[in-house]
UniProtKB/Swiss-Prot annotation:
This protein's name: NADH-ubiquinone oxidoreductase chain 4
Species of the source: Elephas maximus (Indian elephant)
Predominant place of localization: mitochondrion
UniProt similarity note: Belongs to the complex I subunit 4 family.
Catalysed reaction, written as an equation: a ubiquinone + NADH + 5 H(+)(in) = a ubiquinol + NAD(+) + 4 H(+)(out)
Gene responsible for this protein: MT-ND4
Lineage per the UniProt record: Eukaryota, Metazoa, Chordata, Craniata, Vertebrata
Membrane-spanning residues: 21-43, 60-80, 99-119, 147-167, 195-215, 224-244, 257-277, 284-303, 308-330, 351-371, 375-395, 436-456
């Protein structure tokens, strides 16, 4: 694991000691080299002997999420260049350092062997994200968004810390390898049900579960582009990863406790998709669509079947890349029009035809057509939920329909129609932006050729 953590940490001195005009180029190139060098981790031996140590381990559940995290660092750096072009060199280097620190804590979260280390790193991601939102956000509301993000996350996480200390005292270990052998004798009591709730609530806030999601649209809308990318692509997946780990350990309890959360997720999935239909703000629409997709993942994790686990992990990876790409496209519009309102960006297809092609591809993938991995993930989840209860086909089908409607609405509002006057003299699309979109799209297309490497533990 150190072969990914140490080179990532060494990007910090690289950023500070490199010459001012080479800061972006050097950090982007070296981070891209790290992401390419870490792709071999996707090949997991059956006994997991290559990636096991007392502190860190990788299995087929954490590896795809880890690779997604590492892959996103150069993309965040590429996307942020225009946003910081007017800032001082010190600001640029501080921004890059903050992103790298966030990256390191994310890598260590996905690779942690011990639950207390997972908790510490899970909370450590909060500080750099807060700094990115509140220091480099665009509007004054960023402080409000930062406080929402902070309090929701901390209020959800405090019971988890108390519960982990209780488990440590009771069982004597928090090691993820040991716990399956120690938690076999959990009884269905009120106290153990509360233990399950406190363990999962921190991750449900991070997902977020419908009802605990109010921090997400605010944080997404006010964050700069790198903040939006890392929030959508990885921080939401931290919640899914934590829930997958915890619910497998507390397995008999999950089957007693899952019903209200399943109902809430089914309801929230349709509600947030419907909210998307009446959004005027581009980033807010993409943020609410993230809540809708993550509700599907919560349903899959709660159902506790091999197919649903495979669907949850596949959809998390697919959504991470797709939503990150949509945020990059929304940001490219914002950099030209200086507004997130969709109707003001109408008619951009005639001015930026190549960017319109990227919009079309991203919108299509968001609608989950064959042969994308989005479809594979959604099919696995819908099939599993249908086998649990036939009635789930109605909210699931309605959600698929509304998702198609709001995605087409977003696409047509921003790209088609008569060009507004203020958009006549905008900048053309840059090679940097086209490269950024291609690097989002390439993994999605390649994974659709061989999806089994991201299907997780149960494949």
């Amino acid at each position: 694991m150190l072969k990914t953590i140490l080179p990532t940490i060494m990007l910090i001195p690289l950023a500070w000691f490199t010459s001012n005009n080479m800061v972006w180029i050097n950090t982007t190139l070296y981070s891209f080299a790290i992401s390419l060098a870490s792709l071999h981790l996707l090949h997991q031996p059956l006994d997991n002997s290559l990636n096991l140590s007392p502190e860190f381990f990788l299995d087929s559940l954490s590896t795809p999420l880890l690779i997604l995290t590492i892959w996103l660092l150069p993309l965040m750096l590429i996307a942020s260049q225009a946003h910081l072009s007017s800032g001082s060199t010190f600001q640029k280097k501080s921004y890059i350092t903050t992103i790298i620190l966030l990256q390191v804590s994310l890598i260590m979260t996905f690779a942690a062997t011990d639950l207390i280390l997972l908790y510490i790193m899970f909370e450590a991601t909060l500080i750099p994200t807060m700094i990115i939102i509140t220091r480099w956000g665009n509007q004054l509301e960023r402080l409000n968004a930062g406080s929402y993000f902070l309090f929701y996350t901390l209020m959800g996480s405090l019971p988890l810390l108390v519960t982990l200390m209780l488990i440590q005292n009771t069982l004597g270990s928090l090691n993820l390898m040991m716990l399956p052998y120690l938690t076999k004798s959990i009884d269905n009591l009120w106290s153990t049900n509360m233990l399950w709730l406190t363990c999962t609530m921190a991750f449900m806030v991070k997902m977020p579960l419908y009802g605990l999601h109010l921090w997400l649209p605010k944080a997404h809308v006010e964050a700069p582009i790198a903040g939006s990318m890392v929030l959508a692509a990885i921080l939401l997946k931290l919640g899914g990863y934590g829930m997958l780990r915890i619910t497998i350990l507390l397995d008999p309890l999950t089957m007693h406790m899952y019903y209200p959360f399943l109902m809430l997720s089914l309801w929230g999935m349709v509600m947030t998709s419907s909210i998307c239909l009446r959004q005027t703000d581009m980033k807010s629409l993409i943020a609410y669509s993230s809540v809708s997709h993550m509700a599907l993942v919560i349903i899959a994790i709660m159902l506790q079947t091999p197919w649903s686990f495979m669907g949850a992990l596949t959809l998390m990876i697919a959504h991470g890349l797709t939503s990150s790409m949509l945020f990059c496209l929304a940001n490219s519009n914002y950099e030209r029009i200086h507004s997130r309102t969709m109707i003001l960006a109408r008619g951009l297809q005639t001015l930026l035809p190549l960017m319109a092609a990227w919009w079309l591809l991203a919108s299509l993938i968001n609608m989950a057509p064959p042969p994308t991995i989005n479809l594979i993930g959604e099919l696995l989840i819908i099939t599993t939920s249908f086998s649990w209860s036939n009635l789930t086909i109605f909210p699931m089908g309605l959600n698929v329909l509304i998702t198609t409607m709001y995605t087409l609405h977003m696409m047509t509002t921003t790209q088609r129609g008569k060009t507004s006057h203020h958009a006549k003299s905008i900048k053309p699309s840059f090679t940097r932006e086209n490269t950024l979109m291609a690097l989002h799209l390439l993994p999605l297309l390649l994974l659709s050729l061989n999806p089994k490497i991201i299907l997780g533990l149960m494949y």
